[in-house]
Amino acid sequence: MGEPITGRLSADSGVKFVSASVGVDDDRFLIMNTGGYGYIAEYKNMISNKKSGRAFMRLPENAEMLKAIPVRKNHTHIAAVSNIGKLLIFEIDELPILGKGKGNKIINIPKDKLAAGEEFMAHAQLLATDSSLRIEVGKRFVTLKPKDWSEYIPVSYTHLTLPTKNE
């Protein structure tokens, strides 16, 4: 069932489709990549009337796009996590609204570690002021309520690390 997306779009060889989004002009989405960069985009700037699409995000070398996340009016914070357990929570207003570009650094990923595949931004989640964030690692998990977020919201814009099993 269904229709191949390549019937509607002409993509270069090796292009990987990561996400599909539906919205109206003023809807907003968090656009980000594994290199740790991202920005907020309005839906009207995400649309192309050309079959070949359009340049939308400049990727750092060796980075890949992550799934676009719809931004709702009640979302106030972004929680970003790397594959090695770094967690950063910050206010959504700290990210710019752009039509295209590289965006701002969401979480620090060293270029050499990204190139080697050792470290990358794995995921981000949008949070409302009454949200709880559940982080699962294997069979273990931790739930962070808003009162717990301050530990992961830096005074200066740098990343913090979750304690590991050995600490």
Segments predicted by a language model, with ranges:
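Short, structured "edge-of-domain" segments at secondary-structure transitions
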Residues: 1-167
